Structures are given as structure tokens and as C-alpha cells.
């Protein structure tokens, strides 16, 4: 049997790029909670002792940007300079302007257009992907890398591994078999974890704790064997981390946010963007479409693409590819997708309830992936029942 190796990586919430994603989405949540019609394009950058929030926001909401920044950093665990950032004493810079009136008139007519008339906030193309290799209908390499990162944060915050600090990265290589287009994971080939730590812990303690408290609870035993390779803090030392170690910027972890390198990506980031930005809402609706195709038994694996022009409600194109795993021809599946999903941005916002803020709704998406999550706020993960004529056995 021919096999191949595929690798996906993740970073946890203390990575400086992810800190920025979370601040940007915390701002979005605050805007939508007070004003669901808010138009938000919020970027964040960070370096030692500094967080800057900038972009274009038009909203009726009264937003305390500095408080949002400090609260978000504090919740992550950046509470002193020695861990990479001090939430209460770092500098916070804010440079927010209103949305360009040229964009506003073209996209939503300065809030005069009905939902079905709202145009895309920009041009672009987005991809949704699904595969039957996991219960989440997500790639196993991505799922495991993401869950390892989430587990790192969990054992740091609950005190199981008190030597952990907020920053960290994970990577998982899985050995796969290609079953006529469907992906069948056979085993985990390599596990890589690089995590920030305090100065007192030894490398042996790090390796022991990571295997016992992070890897074993996350990776099913059936995927591990005597040949699985473990690289646990292979650089030997990772005390300096967070914004002290590296600069951070919103939108630099788009593969981690999506499918871990599987499928495809149109290049647009998610965090800090309201639903008129099809980089986000378009990617959410095509994930629901791809997931629904697989969940309804139309295919074992599927990718869906949609594309837009700025100011135009209707998509320019919709594309479906089932990698040869479709139960019926892809052309018929494409017709089913077009009949069951409304790709107009205003209707995506309504059908996926994307204008609802509060509950840290979009902040939750900004770490550990936007897809494959079991959370009622992730409305795009709800499978739509699709009607199709199943061929007789």
C-alpha cells in the first residue's frame, strides 16, 4: 500500500500573531454587541511592551479600545514582562478611522440597502473543505496540531504544568493512504511541540510533562507506535516569548485558522472583519457547503470555491471538486450546492447569524481554528440536510 506524509502546524493563543487576531476579534465582538450594523476592519500589531490597534471602523458603539486590548492580553496570560508582555503596563496605541465613504456607498449604500442587495466588501475567492477522516470532518493532521495547542494552554492555566508560559507552537505529521481520492490516516509519524517555559524547568521535565499531560490526552493511542518521532522543545531553550520574542500581526496565521494546508486558500484573513467582508463570511458559507456535502454522503472529501467582486451581491463563480469521491457527478453536486446555499453576503450574515456579537463569539474563533469546532456560536459548522436522488445499490 502506497502512503505519504502530510504535516500541519498550529500556534496557541500566546503566540504574538494569535494575540493580535484575538484583540482584533475582541474589538469586532464589542462593536457588534452594541451595533450589529458595525463595519469593522480592525488590525492589531504588537512588539515588546506595545500593542497597537488600527484600521477602519464605522459604528454607533462606544468602544474602549485600550480596555479591550488590556483585558484580552491579561486573559491570555500576559501579566508580566518576563512572560513576554505586561497587560496592565504596556503601551496601547489606537489609530482608528471610519470606513471609506467610497466603499460604504458601493457595498451597503451607507446602510440603505436591503440584506439581499448588500454587495461584497471586496473582491476575492474563498475555499471551504471537508473530509470524512475525522468526526469533525476536518483533516486529522490539522485537528491534532490544533488540539495539542489548546491542551498546552489548558494545562498552563489549570496549573498542571506550572512551568508553561503563554507562547507555543505545535506540528503533527501524519502518514496517509489515498483511497481513491479519500484520505485515510494510518499513524502519526512525528509530533513537534515548542513551548515557552520558565527558567527553572529542565528539558527532561519538559519532555516528560508534554508526553504525559499534553500528547497522551490528545492523540489517540491507535495513531502512536514505537516509530513515532517526538521533537519536544528541540531548540533546547524557549524562555523569551510572546511579543518580546517576536513581533505579531493580525492575519498571519490563515492556514492554521482553516485546514492546516489541506484544500486551498484564497489568501484573505478572518479576524477583525465584520460579515460584509467576504474573506470571512464567504469562507464560512463554503465550509458549511463542503461539510454538508460530506455529511450528507454525497462525497467523502470535498472542496468548494466561491468568488466575488466588490459591491456585487451575487458571486462571480461557485466551484465544487470531490477529488473523485462523489457519489454522483461533481456537476450535479454543484447544482445541489447552488440550490441549497445563498452566497450573497447579506444573506450569509442572516442565515449564519453573523451579526450577533457578545459571548466572545468571534474572539473564540481567533485561537484554535475557525472550523471543526463543537460550539453553537460556530453556526457555519451546522450541517444542512441536502436533498438528492441517491443511486440505487
UniProtKB/Swiss-Prot annotation:
Compartments it resides in: Cytoplasm
Q: Which GO terms describe its molecular function?
A: ATP binding; metal ion binding; methionine adenosyltransferase activity
Task: Summarize the record's induction comment.
Answer: Repressed in roots by ABA and mannitol.
Asked if the keyword Magnesium belongs to this entry, the reply reads yes
The terms describing its cellular component in GO are: cytosol
Residues bound to L-methionine = 56, 99, 246, 277
Q: What is this protein called?
A: S-adenosylmethionine synthase 2
The Gene Ontology biological process annotation of the record reads: one-carbon metabolic process; S-adenosylmethionine biosynthetic process
Name the Pfam families for this protein.
Answer: S-AdoMet_synt_C, S-AdoMet_synt_M, S-AdoMet_synt_N
- What's the family? Belongs to the AdoMet synthase family.
User: Which reaction equations make up its catalytic activity?
Assistant: L-methionine + ATP + H2O = S-adenosyl-L-methionine + phosphate + diphosphate
Q: PANTHER family attached here?
A: S-ADENOSYLMETHIONINE SYNTHETASE
Name the source's superkingdom: Eukaryota
Per its database record, what is this protein's job?
Catalyzes the formation of S-adenosylmethionine from methionine and ATP. The reaction comprises two steps that are both catalyzed by the same enzyme: formation of S-adenosylmethionine (AdoMet) and triphosphate, and subsequent hydrolysis of the triphosphate.
Q: In which residues is Mg(2+) bound?
A: 9
Q: Which residues bind ATP?
A: 15, 167-169, 235-238, 246, 252-253, 269, 273, 277
Q: Does the keyword ATP-binding apply?
A: yes
Q: What is its main location?
A: cytoplasm
Q: Where does K(+) bind?
A: 43
Q: Please give the subunit comment from the record.
A: Homotetramer.
Amino acid at each position: 500500500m502506497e502512503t505519504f506524509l502530510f504535516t500541519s502546524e498550529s500556534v496557541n493563543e500566546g503566540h504574538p500573531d494569535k494575540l493580535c487576531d484575538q484583540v482584533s476579534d475582541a474589538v469586532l465582538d464589542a462593536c457588534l454587541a452594541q451595533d450589529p450594523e458595525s463595519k469593522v476592519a480592525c488590525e492589531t500589531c504588537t512588539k515588546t511592551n506595545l500593542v497597537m490597534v488600527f484600521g477602519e471602523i464605522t459604528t454607533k458603539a462606544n468602544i474602549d479600545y485600550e480596555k479591550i486590548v488590556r483585558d484580552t492580553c491579561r486573559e491570555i496570560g500576559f501579566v508580566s514582562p518576563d512572560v513576554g508582555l505586561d497587560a496592565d503596563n504596556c503601551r496601547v496605541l489606537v489609530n482608528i478611522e471610519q470606513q471609506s465613504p467610497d466603499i460604504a456607498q458601493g457595498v451597503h449604500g451607507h446602510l440603505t440597502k436591503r440584506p439581499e442587495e448588500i454587495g461584497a466588501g471586496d473582491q476575492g475567492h474563498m475555499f471551504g473543505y471537508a473530509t470524512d477522516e475525522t468526526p469533525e470532518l476536518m483533516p486529522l493532521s490539522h485537528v491534532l496540531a490544533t488540539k495539542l495547542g489548546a491542551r498546552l494552554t489548558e494545562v498552563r492555566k489549570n496549573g498542571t504544568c506550572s512551568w508553561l508560559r503563554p507562547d507555543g507552537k505545535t506540528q503533527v505529521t501524519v502518514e496517509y493512504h489515498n483511497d481513491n481520492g479519500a484520505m485515510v490516516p494510518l499513524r502519526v509519524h512525528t509530533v513537534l511541540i515548542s513551548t515557552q517555559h520558565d527558567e527553572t524547568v529542565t528539558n527532561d521535565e519538559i519532555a516528560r510533562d508534554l508526553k504525559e499531560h499534553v500528547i497522551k490526552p490528545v492523540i489517540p493511542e491507535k495513531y502512536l507506535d514505537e516509530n513515532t518521532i517526538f521533537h519536544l522543545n528541540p531548540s533546547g531553550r524557549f524562555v523569551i516569548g510572546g511579543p518580546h520574542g517576536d513581533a505579531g500581526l493580525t492575519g498571519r496565521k490563515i492556514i492554521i485558522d482553516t485546514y492546516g494546508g489541506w484544500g486551498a486558500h484564497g489568501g484573505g484573513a478572518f479576524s477583525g472583519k465584520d460579515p460584509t467582508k467576504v474573506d470571512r463570511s464567504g469562507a464560512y458559507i463554503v465550509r458549511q457547503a463542503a461539510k454538508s456535502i460530506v455529511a450528507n454522503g454525497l462525497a467523502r472529501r470535498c472542496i468548494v470555491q466561491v468568488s466575488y467582486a466588490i459591491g456585487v451581491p451575487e458571486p462571480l463563480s461557485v466551484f465544487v471538486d470531490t477529488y473523485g469521491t462523489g457519489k454522483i457527478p461533481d456537476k450535479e453536486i454543484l447544482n445541489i450546492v447552488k440550490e441549497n446555499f445563498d452566497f450573497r453576503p447579506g444573506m450569509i450574515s442572516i442565515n449564519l447569524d453573523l451579526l450577533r456579537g457578545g459571548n466572545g463569539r468571534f474572539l473564540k474563533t481567533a485561537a484554535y481554528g475557525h472550523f471543526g469546532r463543537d460550539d453553537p456560536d460556530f453556526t457555519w459548522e451546522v450541517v444542512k440536510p441536502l436533498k438528492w436522488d441517491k443511486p440505487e445499490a
